[in-house]
């Protein structure tokens, strides 16, 4: 509640107090409530915390609405600005995210979470070098952030610096042992380097850490096992290995049909070699029939 403060109006002229003339028409002096900026900022932070909780429950639209109001109340609070920027990034509005996060960074230049968010924004903008710069700055202040190490690994992968990418993915797992996306992406790098068996081993490890349910490592294992079994040849198509690979891959596609979209796979950093193998898998008659239904 805003506090209502009484206001005494006096008009001073040459040291004299001039009384109003009741017999004459006179404009009323407007009564203006003074703004309590400290209270507004406090209310903005409270709304931002509510928005953060909604985002954690994946209620992003409601979170975005609250965060927008929070910024109106606390326009100079770095954390509030960063929250709204992060929600815009989640919504794919990268330019709005960049504007807010840049402003937040100017207010709190050493805050690692803001630097991480700027790195993620530049990743989406495909400015991988800038992304790596922000992520490295943030990691100097918070070196064991598994998500940021994962993002930095992705930036290095997209810069074709594979050894650096694997090093950051391994650091991510060292920081958080069950961080399966980093293990999954080590598999992506290894496969592009021609190490198919080692890649499959990483995907199997990632799948186990994810409780056996994540479609991405499941599909990757399937398409590579299908290729290794030479399952396109009619003589091999009925083999146990080929049937297991087909079943696993089709289950993954049924779990999440986005993985049937080659553009989506590329966005998830599936490289040229793995995409070629996947296209062969998608050409199998049973898979083609499934794709037509998805």
Residue ranges of each PLM-predicted region?
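Structural marker of alpha-solenoid helical repeat scaffolds
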Residues: 73, 107-108, 141, 175-176, ...
